[in-house]
Amino acid sequence: MAEAEGSSPLLLQPPPPPPRMAEVETPTGAETDMKQYHGSGGVVMDVERSRFPYCVVWTPIPVLTWFFPIIGHMGICTSAGVIRDFAGPYFVSEDNMAFGKPAKFWKLDPGQVYASGPNAWDTAVHDASEEYKHRMHNLCCDNCHSHVALALNLMRYNNSTNWNMVTLCCFCLIYGKYVSVGAFVKTWLPFVLLLGIILTVSLVFNLR
């Protein structure tokens, strides 16, 4: 009995505490937004919210685009997708593109930015926008395309400082993608209708 009583303290030792559960952090709203744009290792577009990170965007101009479908209004987006566009004399719009939401976008590669310094893309977009807040809008030679060209020149996109409104118009025509079928129809249908009317009238007069 003495031995049993002497060994009882060893048998009655309390069991070790269970391992603690790992704490799970709840993501904040800001972290959720970051995942929306940078999830899957890349930047995600949001057409509904008009967010086109690292893109040149384009939308038709009423009447002008009806006759010349390759001519429209252009803007450039920040790394977060916010649109900046030279919308009028001494005014650069932010997140409210003139003539409506983008119909077409041209996705650029931030890895092709050769300017030095942190956030070179956003810095170039900001500096170009600040510059055009002091400029008069000229439809023929200093317009929305010129604003985008200045931003690309400041960031030395594709290691070039020769961007201009002609090259932008051509590249956007070749590499631009429509956001939807409706955007494509909105751009080209008026031109097709006008062309059909002109051809019809021409045929009628030639048959007389």
UniProtKB/Swiss-Prot annotation:
GO terms for cellular component: dendrite; membrane. It is found in: Membrane; Cell projection, Dendrite. The chain crosses the membrane at residues 56-76, 165-185, 187-207. Its main location: membrane. Residues 1-55, 186 are extracellular. It is a multi-pass membrane protein. Keywords: Cell projection, Membrane, Transmembrane, Transmembrane helix. Residues 1-34 are annotated as: Disordered. Residues 77-164, 208 are cytoplasmic. It comes from the Eukaryota. This is Transmembrane protein 222.
